[in-house]
Regions:
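P-loop NTP-binding core
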Residues: 1-263
Length: 263
């Protein structure tokens, strides 16, 4: 989950997409790669009480299994972040294969999960480069407000470089419109502009602006546990369905088999 522009809904999407995928009985791991650790707290993890985080895995070579914590949702685990991650990029400069540290770490547990979601900070630093090097694909949240496309060109250039130098398999999973309000002309203009630029790469699902969705992180809960009937909950369930169906079609196409969509 990446976009160098802050406040576009990366963390909110990570938390609630993960919970929604788990609702469809998928095993999911959230990796919180943002020093603010909002994805960790939004999933109910008290970072003051943990012994091992992403930082210890990267810098101290801690066993990744020791950094995996369960959540209140069955099938959903998290590797939490820590404020110490702020200085990790400097500490990583002397590491061998420093761009592949997170990939090598996640390769140890990749087969334990159907989906691994990495919440990146709003920067294109070494931690984000690590996340993109480890990823199969990138979801790019785009806020339905002024300057929505600001910074996306730079992100796309970074993805292009990583694809050519570090991770040839890296793809764009899709652009996700967030904080959408159909009553606002601007929101509809942004939607049309993003659709015109990126066409089939834009998710059909949009995430509407929603009070319950904004409130749920302060309670340490995904919105599906905070208010299952809210628009925020329904939007993320729809997004999870779209991603599951897209990926199952992709797998079945490779296997030359048939697929059955989630309804």
């Amino acid at each position: 989950m990446a976009n160098q522009k802050g406040g576009v809904g990366k963390t909110t999407t990570t938390i609630n997409l993960a919970a929604s995928l788990a609702t469809f009985e998928k095993t999911v791991l959230v990796v919180d790669a943002d020093p603010q650790a909002n994805a960790s707290s939004g999933l109910g993890v008290d970072i003051k009480e943990i012994d091992c985080s992403l930082y210890e895995c990267i810098i101290d070579h801690a066993d990744v299994h020791d950094a995996v914590y369960t959540t209140d949702i069955n099938g959903l685990d998290v590797i939490p972040s820590h404020i110490d991650l702020v200085g990790a990029e400097i500490e990583m400069l002397n590491l061998k294969n420093r761009e592949r540290v997170i990939k090598n770490m996640l390769d140890q547990i990749r087969d334990d999960y159907d989906y691994i979601l990495v919440d990146c900070s709003p920067s294109l630093g070494l931690i984000t480069v690590n996340a993109l090097t480890a990823a199969d694909s990138v979801i790019i949240p785009v806020q339905c407000e002024y300057f929505a496309l600001e910074g996306i060109t730079k992100l796309l250039n970074t993805i292009k470089i990583i694809k050519s130098k570090l991770n040839p398999a890296l793809e764009i999973e899709g652009f996700l419109l967030t904080m959408y309000d159909s009553r606002l002309r601007l929101a509809n203009q942004i939607y049309d502009e993003v659709k015109r630029h990126f066409q089939e790469l834009v998710f059909k699902t949009v995430i509407q602006r929603n009070v319950k969705l904004s409130e749920s992180p302060s309670h340490g809960l995904p919105v599906i546990l905070y208010d299952a009937d809210s628009a925020g909950s329904k939007n993320h369930l729809a997004l999870a369905k779209e991603i599951i169906n897209k990926n199952e079609k992709r797998v079945n196409k490779q296997d030359d088999g048939s697929t059955q969509e989630i309804q």
